[in-house]
Amino acid sequence: MRPPQRAHSEPPTVSGRWLLMAVSAALLAAAACAWLTLCFLFWQGSWQLLYHPTAAVAHTPADAGLAFDPVAFATGEDGAPRLKGWWIPAAPGANYSRYTVLYLHGQAGNLGDTVDELAALHVVGVNILAFDYRGYGQSQAAHPSESHLREDAESALNYLAGTRHVSANTIVVEGSALGANLALEIGAAHPELAGVVLDSPLAAPVDVLFNDPRSRLVPAHLLVRDRFNAVQAAVALRIPSLWLESSSTGQPVALREDDPGIYRQAGGAKMRVWLKPASAPSQEFLNAWSRWLDDLPARATASRP
């Protein structure tokens, strides 16, 4: 007698619809992971679109014949100073030696690229403290950011007050390019300072990030924290300000219709001067500084609410 034959079981079948959904879900998950990775990479590296620091300091004030002292301050948790810079005293008998200029350089290079500007300030006759932000020159290695630059500028003010014993009402903060935007923020936050000098502030410096083609693929406005809101800082300014603007003729340049009007909205007593680009300090540059410093006590009084 033959044993009963077992029924052949049918192999399981997979629904085509289910398979399509599984493949779609896998593709969506992969796309989401790729997009999140892109967001992370943009968040991590976008600072390089705005800041262009270099480490090697090629020049010092000695190259311009200036006496100076190397300085280091803002001690970190490891006990080492985070910031390096130069103290350049005014020449003996200089007209404005009672004033000290805290110089904030721009977003590119390092302190070694500012020797010509510092030499021009020395001709004006003021004391100068210039330093590199973290991530620049010989200062502590770090990615620059608006918050870091702001903290470093505050540390420089503390150094002037605590180590150099400089009175706040004799400190003028000068900034160039992005440094001018930083000087605006510092000036708005410290009404006890003598004033600010703004050399070609940037109307919207962070636009370089938002105009980059890669920013269209990610929520750049949520990923970028830096703003450098010049208009907001200008409105809050309550101390005297000198605005140095460049034009090829040295004459005022007509403002664009979309100009945010940083100067127009600035508070406090203000003075604006248009200068031709020059490799050496022009007489117009020196005259602008002299006029502004001569009138600074009166301007300070006029700026008080």
Predicted regions, residues:
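Short alpha-helix in the alpha/beta-hydrolase fold that links the catalytic acid
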Residues: E117, A230, I239, P252-R264
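Glycine-rich nucleophile elbow surrounding the catalytic serine of serine-hydrolase chemistry
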Residues: G175-E185
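Membrane-embedded segments
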Residues: D78-A161
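An N-terminal hydrophobic leader/cap segment in hydrolases
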Residues: A31-T75
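Active-site nucleophile loop of the alpha/beta-hydrolase fold
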Residues: V197-D207, D226-N229
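C-terminal catalytic histidine-bearing segment of alpha/beta-hydrolase fold enzymes
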Residues: P260-P305
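Alpha/beta-hydrolase fold nucleophile elbow
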Residues: H165-A177
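Short beta-strand/loop motif that positions the catalytic acidic residue
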Residues: A236-R238, W243-S247
